[in-house]
Amino acid sequence: MSITLESLSACLKNALGDALVQTIERLGELTLVVKPQAYAPAMLALRDHPDCRFEQLIDLCGVDYSGYGEGAWEGPRFAVVAHLLSVSKNARVRVRVFCPDDDLPAVASVVDIWPAASWFEREAFDLYGIVFEGHPDLRRILTDYGFIGHPFRKDFPLSGNVEMRYDPTQQRVIYQPVSIEPRDNVPRVVRDESYGDGRA
């Protein structure tokens, strides 16, 4: 049996109490913004509270809000977004928590609540540098162990910092500074006024 968005929102507000900062209903979906210090208890309540029962963590990712809305964003830079599914109630919810420190973004791990979060949290750590406190094995998962930086951050250089190549003289893979020159891709301006109207 499916639950309406309004009744789901009321149940979640009751279950989360002061941990809830904001609820957003948009495009038929419900987003909950929770306090960073109450993130893990709120997620546990979403799983175990009888009005919620979100048994499955579908996805968890990091977000870099710098430059969001054409630079109009004034809130914290990094957030963690989780999508939860309640099979028993046929309901979905999105949970967003903002990292309080932009220099060292960190939130609690939810691996103890949903073991499936392990690799999602490792991915967010690898790509955004978000630290998940209490994670049993927080290390890179997609980039090389010697990789410098976090490639999904908006201030990461487009061409990267170093490049890998095989050196036949050393017979091994080596790292070297990026040799690609940065360039601006400016669209070509067509000055012919009849361009594109079918005339030759």
Swiss-Prot record:
May I have one GO cellular component term? plasma membrane
- The entry's protein name is NADH-quinone oxidoreductase subunit C
Main function: NDH-1 shuttles electrons from NADH, via FMN and iron-sulfur (Fe-S) centers, to quinones in the respiratory chain. The immediate electron acceptor for the enzyme in this species is believed to be ubiquinone. Couples the redox reaction to proton translocation (for every two electrons transferred, four hydrogen ions are translocated across the cytoplasmic membrane), and thus conserves the redox energy in a proton gradient.
Topology versus the membrane: Peripheral membrane protein
Gene that specifies this protein: nuoC
- Localization of this protein: Cell inner membrane
Task: Could you list this entry's UniProt keywords, alphabetically sorted.
Answer: Cell inner membrane, Cell membrane, Membrane, NAD, Quinone, Translocase, Transport, Ubiquinone
Q: Supply one GO molecular-function term.
A: NADH dehydrogenase (ubiquinone) activity
Q: Which family does it belong to?
A: Belongs to the complex I 30 kDa subunit family.
Taken from the record, one Pfam family name reads Complex1_30kDa
EC top class named in words: translocase
Q: Does the keyword NAD apply?
A: yes
* Superkingdom assignment: Bacteria
The annotated subunit structure for this chain is: NDH-1 is composed of 14 different subunits. Subunits NuoB, C, D, E, F, and G constitute the peripheral sector of the complex.
- EC number(s) given by UniProt: 7.1.1.-
Annotated organism of origin: Thiobacillus denitrificans (strain ATCC 25259 / T1)
Record-linked Gene3D superfamilies = NADH:ubiquinone oxidoreductase, 30kDa subunit
The reactions it catalyses are: a quinone + NADH + 5 H(+)(in) = a quinol + NAD(+) + 4 H(+)(out)
